[in-house]
Every structure is written in C-alpha cells, then in structure tokens.
Amino acid sequence: MRDIALFVKDFQKGTELSNLLTNIDMHVTFAESIYDLPDQCQIGIIDLDDEKFGNVKFVSELNRHTEMMLLGYMEKITKDIQDKLKAAGCNMILPTASVVKNIPSVIREIAK
C-alpha cells in the first residue's frame, strides 16, 4: 500500500478522490501542510485552484522538503501558470474536469 497526500479543501472532490484511491489500494492522508505527511509519502495531489495550496511558494516548499511526485489539478490551465508550477516542482497538471476520471490510471502508472 502506497501513501498519497491530498492537499484538497473541497469536501466533495476530496471524497471522490479518496474513494477512488482507496479502491486501488492507496493509503490516503488529507494534509494541510508538509508537517501532516506520513513518513513514506510518495505522491501528493494538489488542488491548484485553492488559495493556500495553488501557488508557486507552496508547491516549491513541498518539492524542496519531500521527495513526493506532485500532481496538481486546476479548472483553467494556462501555459504561463503551468510553466511556473512545473518549475516549482509540480510534475503533472490535469484539468479539474478530468482528474476524478483519470487519477486511478495515472496513479497506477506512477506506482509501477
């Protein structure tokens, strides 16, 4: 079982993601900061539309202090914002509309 941290404040989206991830044998932790993470957390999923989590400073800090693969999702992806977040350490950015549908296959691929 692998550990995944969800940096998601939207209750509905968090519940959907948590259920899907639990179904593919992932251990899910809802986190508010880097200090809430399990010791061996491999993947972080970030709501990039959230004011607290969806900024270069937070992503950069998370990247600097952990060795997690960081996956983000946001409503509207622009090249400028995507480039900044990727430079800060976000490995992949998905559209919000497809994150629930695609996250199980993305996580399975990463977990190989």
Question: What feature does the model see in each segment?
Answer:
Residues 103-112:
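Receiver (REC) domain switch/output surface
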Residues 89-101:
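Output/docking surface of receiver
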Residues 31-43:
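Acidic, metal-coordinating helix/loop segments flanking the phosphotransfer/catalytic sites
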Residues 45-62:
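Conserved phosphotransfer microenvironments
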Residues 77-91:
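Alpha4 helix (beta4-alpha4-beta5 surface) of REC/receiver domains from two-component response regulators
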Residues 6-11, 46-50, 74-75:
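Structural motif
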Residues 1-27:
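Short, charged N-terminal beta->alpha structural module
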Residues 68-77:
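A short, hydrophobic beta-strand element within the central beta-sheet of small alpha/beta folds
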